Amino acid sequence: MKKTTKMFVMAALLMAGSQIHAQEEHQYVDLGLPSGTLWATCNVGANSPEEAGDYFAWGETTPKEKYYWTTYKYSYNGAESAFTKYCTDGRYGDGRHGYNGFYDNLIVLQAGDDAATVTWGNEWCTPTKEQWDELKSNTTSSRTTQNGISGRLYTSKKNGSSIFLPLAGYRWDRWENKLEGVGYNAQYWSSTLNDKDSSMAWAYIITSAEWKVKSINRSSGVSVRPVRSAK
């Protein structure tokens, strides 16, 4: 991000009442959350809060052309129900077993499989399901636009600081290689696997009607908004 761009972004957010902090080249907001979690102002791959950034399958650390089971890193031979990592059930069963009886009971992304950590450094990670729940419980949410981009603004109930999540859409290319739902919905990964169905991982879903934590297909191309711990 260029210096002038950084100054513009910081000024805009400060005007909105947020206390912006810089950590090397990545900025974050203290929302006064009980856990002390600090939320980044931008998505991975973005240069401003309203920019979509990159899309990632769950547990993958680089964007790609096609998001489906046939291209998913941890799917055995393109199967949607046979996994080589992050699996809680080795028995045969739709969408919840490892290849050839494999299971590892890993339910949280390891650092080397976390797009936020690999891209931004060890102090950053993808939020857990619990951190998304905490954000939703401790902020108010409103539909808004920022520099012409639709999204939701999450404002702290404690200190009035806020973060903007753009409606960046998502990728899942079973039939066509295209981006879905830009300006209407968004999906943001958590680092937490659905331990009842290993084909799914938890994500924060934003639509015109709702915003909640929900499990989705882990081969989908989804946004990542990093978090870090307070120093």
Model-derived features: where do they sit?
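Bacterial Sec-dependent N-terminal signal peptides
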Residues: 1-23
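Conserved positions within compact, well-structured domain cores
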Residues: 23-231
